[in-house]
Amino acid sequence: MTTDTHTLHIEEILDLLPHRFPFLLVDRVLDFEEGKFLRAVKNVSFNEPFFQGHFPGKPIFPGVLILEAMAQATGILAFKSRGKLEPGELYYFAGIDEARFKRPVVPGDQMIMEVEFVKERRGLTRFTGVAKVDGEIVCTATMMCARSKPATAVVIKSEVTKSEGTKSEVGKPDVKES
């Protein structure tokens, strides 16, 4: 673990997180220290797909997505602190406590997420998070995340036999070890 602080650009974020458009909610990491804290930014654009329905005529960034953006920031901090995931592993958002929303986030806002490592116990890592716009707090929460072991893949068969024209075991899981 190093004590350097630095930024991460979108290419590095894409290398660390499995999320992609429209669910990647971290545009840039402004600063971090491994095992300590991370500051990231989400530029909120009117073109976000959820603004069509949340809410027509008065677009507001959904609160659950503010929490998801902070959770993605914790994932980046965890990966930079503990190493990247192995094939088959995932980093799950495992819980949230004391979430509070202070004011709406709207198109044109630049949301800064600040997350801090609190502790790790029994495979769960606890973080605190604060989201701000123009220095004003918009959301606070305590989040828990868990790094999974490589999972067993479940493949659903969806074959149709050509000779009989009937479905063979459609929808039945075929479990394979990964």
Curated annotation (Swiss-Prot):
HAMAP family the record matches: FabZ
Catalytic reactions of this protein: a (3R)-hydroxyacyl-[ACP] = a (2E)-enoyl-[ACP] + H2O
The protein's role, per its UniProt record: Involved in unsaturated fatty acids biosynthesis. Catalyzes the dehydration of short chain beta-hydroxyacyl-ACPs and long chain saturated and unsaturated beta-hydroxyacyl-ACPs.
Annotated gene: fabZ
Short name of any one Pfam family annotated for the protein: FabA
Designated name of the protein: 3-hydroxyacyl-[acyl-carrier-protein] dehydratase FabZ
Cellular compartments annotated: Cytoplasm
Molecular function, one GO term: (3R)-hydroxyacyl-[acyl-carrier-protein] dehydratase activity
Catalytic activity, EC: 4.2.1.59
Record-level GO cellular component terms: cytoplasm; membrane
Family note: Belongs to the thioester dehydratase family. FabZ subfamily.
Keyword Methyltransferase recorded: no
UniProt GO BP: fatty acid biosynthetic process; lipid A biosynthetic process
Record bears the keyword Cytoplasm: yes
Active site: H54
Keywords attached to this entry: Cytoplasm, Lipid A biosynthesis, Lipid biosynthesis, Lipid metabolism, Lyase
Record InterPro entries: FabA_FabZ, FabZ, HotDog_dom_sf
Segments traversing the membrane: none
Classification via Gene3D superfamilies: Hotdog Thioesterase (3.10.129.10)
